[in-house]
Amino acid sequence: MSPMQQRELFSSPPIDLLFFEQQALKQGHRVIAGIDEAGRGALCGPVVAAAVILPTGMAIPGVDDSKKLSPRTREQLFDEIMARALSVGIGIGTPQLIDRINILQATRHAMAEAVDILAPRPDMLLIDGISTIDVPLPQKTITKGDSRSLTIAAASIIAKVSRDRMLTELDLLHPGYGFASHKGYGCASHMEAIRRLGPSPVHRLTFRGVREHVTCPSS
């Protein structure tokens, strides 16, 4: 591991990453789950949500918004979070669900699915973004929560690594699109592959950049 990777992995988290967790504890909550998603803006594959419950007061060094971390560091922290969390839930919104009910509702569905898996049952949810979810639990939405809350940041890492692994598997099932490299986002090589090959069974057919290449069957 290089010195830069060591600093990235083992630097102490800012004190304010526990602010929202401490606030919830002062309000009487005892089991706090952080929730985040990965893949909302991609052109293919599922949107993946994760819900994470950490032991009260635990700070895992290096945990931060997954987008700020290198792939190797995310993988290392994924293993650390999975080993130390009280519970982790993962929910999925498939491309078909996204096309049927839209990406926002599919994301909310995946988040609710992730929460339903958790044991013990949380009594407070900290959710990245501005949308609550359909579960009968107290909830607080936090804009840019993946860089402001430790438990949300942990969930962002679980969601991101889980989805990246799924896209690597989809790359083997649907070769030619480069899913393993761009993870389904709309880079130039991906757009060219869609133009050349047409959408795959795991593309989001209602998304701009994909829908233009959907061909209707002849009647």
UniProtKB/Swiss-Prot annotation:
It is an enzyme of class 3 (hydrolase). Residues 30-219 form the RNase H type-2 domain. A divalent metal cation binds at residues 36-37, 128. It is found in: Cytoplasm. PROSITE patterns: RNASE_H_2 (PS51975). Its cofactor is Mn(2+); Mg(2+). GO terms for molecular function: manganese ion binding; RNA binding; RNA-DNA hybrid ribonuclease activity. Its main location: cytoplasm. Its EC number is 3.1.26.4. It catalyses: Endonucleolytic cleavage to 5'-phosphomonoester. One of its GO terms (biological process) is DNA replication, removal of RNA primer. Manganese or magnesium. Binds 1 divalent metal ion per monomer in the absence of substrate. May bind a second metal ion after substrate binding. It comes from the Bacteria. PANTHER family: RIBONUCLEASE H2 SUBUNIT A, RIBONUCLEASE HII. This is Ribonuclease HII. The lineage of its organism: Bacteria, Pseudomonadati, Thermodesulfobacteriota, Desulfuromonadia, Desulfuromonadales. The gene is rnhB.
